[in-house]
Curated annotation (Swiss-Prot):
<dbReference type="InterPro" id="IPR020568">
    <property type="entry name" value="Ribosomal_Su5_D2-typ_SF"/>
</dbReference>
<feature type="modified residue" description="Phosphoserine">
    <location>
        <position position="172"/>
    </location>
</feature>
<protein>
    <recommendedName>
        <fullName>Endoplasmin</fullName>
        <ecNumber>3.6.4.-</ecNumber>
    </recommendedName>
</protein>
<dbReference type="GO" id="GO:0044183">
    <property type="term" value="F:protein folding chaperone"/>
</dbReference>
<feature type="modified residue" description="N6-succinyllysine">
    <location>
        <position position="633"/>
    </location>
</feature>
<dbReference type="GO" id="GO:0005524">
    <property type="term" value="F:ATP binding"/>
</dbReference>
<feature type="modified residue" description="N6-(2-hydroxyisobutyryl)lysine">
    <location>
        <position position="168"/>
    </location>
</feature>
<feature type="region of interest" description="Disordered">
    <location>
        <begin position="290"/>
        <end position="323"/>
    </location>
</feature>
<dbReference type="GO" id="GO:0071287">
    <property type="term" value="P:cellular response to manganese ion"/>
</dbReference>
<dbReference type="GO" id="GO:0031247">
    <property type="term" value="P:actin rod assembly"/>
</dbReference>
<dbReference type="GO" id="GO:0005788">
    <property type="term" value="C:endoplasmic reticulum lumen"/>
</dbReference>
<keyword id="KW-0547">Nucleotide-binding</keyword>
<comment type="subunit">
    <text>Homodimer; disulfide-linked. Component of an EIF2 complex at least composed of CELF1/CUGBP1, CALR, CALR3, EIF2S1, EIF2S2, HSP90B1 and HSPA5. Part of a large chaperone multiprotein complex comprising DNAJB11, HSP90B1, HSPA5, HYOU, PDIA2, PDIA4, PDIA6, PPIB, SDF2L1, UGGT1 and very small amounts of ERP29, but not, or at very low levels, CALR nor CANX. Hyperglycosylated form interacts with OS9; promoting its degradation by the endoplasmic reticulum associated degradation (ERAD). Interacts with AIMP1; regulates its retention in the endoplasmic reticulum.</text>
</comment>
<feature type="modified residue" description="N6-succinyllysine">
    <location>
        <position position="404"/>
    </location>
</feature>
<keyword id="KW-0106">Calcium</keyword>
<dbReference type="GO" id="GO:0071318">
    <property type="term" value="P:cellular response to ATP"/>
</dbReference>
<dbReference type="GO" id="GO:0050750">
    <property type="term" value="F:low-density lipoprotein particle receptor binding"/>
</dbReference>
Length: 802
């Protein structure tokens, strides 16, 4: 023990001597060296650049190598649209900067989806790196944030194309939508993901962005930008990634919060917990570990044990090394998301909030879904699916309807994402439904085109449609009428037209305005429940607005008798009803066409027949003489009460509303045979025998069939009925002339009286004529002055003589 004590004392003395020596060196130091410790404020521009380069050096590259890279790299200017878009993103989303991480992770997930899909047909695709992950690392010392994925990566050309240019049409649409959203006060943060420009949100928090990427078909390259321009150069380190992309952000001073581990973890959980690949964050944690004791501590412990224990002679055992418990900070990759897909879990185990969070994550929407359904289908094909109805219709829902990708269903095969670009996963009219489908029964190692033709896809589609209609049917009536129908009512009507197999189910989802209520909409089920006892048809009237429909002469008698009439006010409505022959055993009757009949007693029937006989001369005169080439026939009307007459289409002809719609078609050229056929069909002219105009016409034609005034009146009544019945007049000038003639007669003005001619305007004088006239006027004035002077002298002479 005494020897150990002496050795310890010697060590202390030696240490003290070294400290004194260091102190002497510090004292002898120069003033410049002391000042150099605090020269940050007086550094030159070159030193600032050097310090910056040192701060953002990449792994394996020092400051001089970074400088050399920048000098040799090829510089590019951003496309004009990209500059505009970046400015708009930065200015509009500066209050919601955190979405940058969501967009970078989303892009990483897309890259991983692509390489996994490629690997199904190319066994060497994953040779560079077997794992499929996203890793995030914060570097506080260097002010850097790294996001790395092992996805498909980018070639040099793709770096230039994907990160430096954008399709002009897409950019223009994005800018327009951003502007509209800002004007409407709506959130703009979701738009950047929907339009594929999320990468540029990195400049919300970064002064510089460095992208290192390795594609299987190219060497590793580095892309760098400060948002003003960008450069690309081959990575001198070679292939360090194996495959994939690392995005390095040099964070702005005010964005330093995004280097905090808790902040990054919370953002990943908030936005990306349902990404289908593991997301890791480089994290620290405190662990308690066993460490071997040092020799002095071990000897001391052994001595204490030998003093306390009694000497017992036992067989010697092998001595175990002595250890102690120590707390250490350990850094490792921490998994942040539950990578088991939510649709693979039983629906009973998934909370409503999880469905909402998953919907927002994969659809890039900010609102909760209106409805959702989670189910497992079994039978000919087994698959799991979650379907959602969004709260509002996606933008451009009917732009190029059916001709482009329009559905939002992501197809997975054995948890491997295949595509979201199938046109046939959902019918066109359900293009607003979003969701995922995952099946184990579909083949993996085939092309997308081959898979699209697979017979099982038709079975999947059929079940998806049925489940979707079940989901929509379960939406509460109030929510359905107030929200769903306003957003997606047109889709349901198109479904009735297009989907023959589900027409009956879709008909139950239809809603229309009706005469039953001034504002509320009604279903066909509700209409049938309110039908009169002997009513066998569902009556409807089509028009450009409710006001036009309910003021039409065709509904006068129906409303007076208490029949409910459905009002069709949208262009697609009449097509929809025409495609639906009946509902619940009741056929539809367009009240603007032939076939409207009422239940009548024997007495009423006799009275009607007597009226028809009384007006037979007028009806024949109209058909054979006054309106000979304009109508098919003239009859006494059963549907008119206030109007004098109406123009009724045949059962298979066009109503006024349909004719207006067909003639307004953008592709209408006037050469379509069927269109011309329907448009040229003559109509039935119905008269109201109780109207004073009609009764007076009957009296007049009995007196004189060739009365020109009555002939004019008949034509004016026909043309007025044409307009009131919803049709267009082929010759509006002739109609106007006839109205003028009728007004002249009513005011006792001679029909042949001509319009008074305007007085002729005096011709304008030329400059020479003006000068001549001024000269003549001057001479006349001079002559007049002389005559006045002579008369004045004469008068004065006469006064003198007197």
């Amino acid at each position: 023990m005494r020897v150990l004590w002496v050795l310890g004392l010697c060590c202390v003395l030696l240490t003290f001597g070294f400290v004194r020596a260091d102190d002497e060196v510090d004292v002898d130091g120069t003033v410049e060296e002391d000042l150099g410790k605090s020269r940050e404020g007086s550094r030159t521009d070159d030193e600032v650049v050097q310090r910056e380069e040192e701060a953002i050096q990449l792994d394996g590259l020092n400051a001089s190598q970074i400088r050399e890279l920048r000098e040799k790299s090829e510089k590019f200017a951003f496309q004009a649209e990209v500059n505009r878009m970046m400015k708009l993103i930065i200015n509009s989303l500066y209050k919601n900067k955190e979405i940058f991480l969501r967009e970078l992770i989303s892009n990483a997930s897309d890259a991983l989806d692509k390489i996994r899909l490629i690997s199904l047909t190319d066994e060497n695709a994953l040779a560079g790196n077997e794992e499929l992950t996203v890793k995030i690392k914060c570097d506080k010392e260097k002010n850097l944030l790294h996001v790395t994925d092992t996805g498909v990566g980018m070639t040099r050309e793709e770096l230039v194309k994907n990160l430096g240019t954008i399709a002009k049409s897409g950019t223009s649409e994005f800018l327009n939508k951003m502007t509209e959203a800002q004007e409407d006060g709506q959130s703009t943060s979701e738009l950047i993901g929907q339009f594929g420009v999320g990468f540029y949100s990195a400049f919300l928090v970064a002064d510089k962005v460095i992208v290192t990427s390795k594609h299987n078909n190219d060497t590793q390259h580095i892309w760098e930008s400060d948002s003003n321009e960008f450069s690309v150069i081959a990575d001198p380190r070679g292939n360090t990634l194996g495959r994939g992309t690392t995005i390095t952000l040099v964070l702005k001073e005010e964005a330093s919060d995004y280097l905090e581990l808790d902040t990054i973890k919370n953002l990943v959980r908030k936005y990306s917990q349902f990404i289908n690949f593991p997301i890791y964050v480089w994290s620290s944690k405190t662990e308690t570990v066993e460490e071997p004791l040092e020799e002095d501590e071990a000897a001391k412990e052994e001595k204490e044990e030998s003093d306390d224990e009694a000497a017992v002679e036992e067989e010697e055992e092998e001595k175990k090394p002595k250890t102690k418990k120590v707390e250490k900070t350990v850094w490792d990759w921490e998994l942040m998301n539950d990578i088991k897909p939510i649709w693979q879990r039983p629906s009973k185990e998934v909370e409503e909030d999880e469905y909402k969070a998953f919907y927002k994550s994969f659809s890039k929407e900010s609102d909760d879904p209106m409805a959702y359904i989670h189910f497992t289908a079994e039978g000919e094909v087994t698959f799991k699916s979650i379907l959602f109805v969004p709260t509002s219709a996606p933008r451009g829902l009917f732009d190029e309807y059916g001709s482009k990708k329009s559905d939002y269903i992501k197809l997975y095969v054995r948890r491997v994402f295949i595509t979201d670009d199938f046109h046939d996963m959902m019918p066109k009219y359900l293009n607003f439904v979003k969701g995922v489908v995952d099946s184990d029964d579909l083949p993996l190692n085939v092309s997308r085109e081959t898979l699209q033709q697979h017979k099982l896809l038709k079975v999947i589609r059929k079940k998806l449609v049925r489940k979707t209609l079940d989901m929509i049917k379960k939406i509460a009536d109030e929510k359905y009428n107030d929200t769903f129908w306003k957003e997606f009512g047109t889709n349901i009507k198109l479904g009735v037209i297009e989907d023959h197999s589900n027409r009956t189910r879709l008909a139950k989802l239809l809603r229309f305005q009706s005469s039953h209520h001034s504002t509320d909409i009604t279903s066909l089920d509700q209409y049938v429940e309110r039908m009169k006892e002997k009513q066998d048809k569902i009556y409807f009237m089509a028009g450009s607005s409710r006001k036009e429909a309910e003021s039409s002469p065709f509904v006068e008698r129906l409303l007076k008798k208490g029949y409910e009439v459905i009002y069709l006010t949208e262009p697609v409505d009449e097509y929809c009803i025409q495609a639906l022959p009946e509902f619940d055993g009741k056929r539809f009757q367009n009240v603007a066409k032939e076939g409207v009949k009422f239940d009548e007693s024997e007495k009423t029937k006799e009275s009607r027949e007597a009226t028809e006989k009384e007006f037979e001369p007028l009806l024949n005169w109209m058909k054979d003489k006054a309106l000979k080439d304009k109508i098919e026939k003239a009859v006494v009307s059963q549907r008119l009460t206030e109007s004098p007459c109406a123009l009724v289409a045949s059962q298979y002809g066009w109503s006024g509303n349909m004719e207006r719609i067909m003639k307004a078609q953008a592709y209408q050229t006037g050469k379509d045979i069927s269109t011309n056929y329907y448009a040229s069909q003559k109509k039935t002219f119905e008269i109201n025998p109780r109207h004073p105009l009609i009764r007076d016409m009957l009296r007049r034609i009995k007196e004189d069939e060739d009365d020109k005034t009555v002939m004019d009146l008949a034509v004016v009544l026909f043309e007025t009925a044409t307009l009131r019945s919803g049709y267009l007049l082929p010759d509006t000038k002739a109609y106007g002339d006839r109205i003028e003639r009728m007004l002249r007669l009513s005011l006792n003005i001679d029909p042949e009286a001509q319009v008074e001619e305007e007085p002729e305007e005096e011709p304008e004088d030329t400059s020479e004529d003006a000068e001549d006239s001024e000269q003549d006027e001057g001479e006349e004035m001079d002559a007049g002055t002389e005559e006045e002077e002579e008369e004045t002298e004469k008068e004065s002479t006469e006064k003198d003589e007197l």
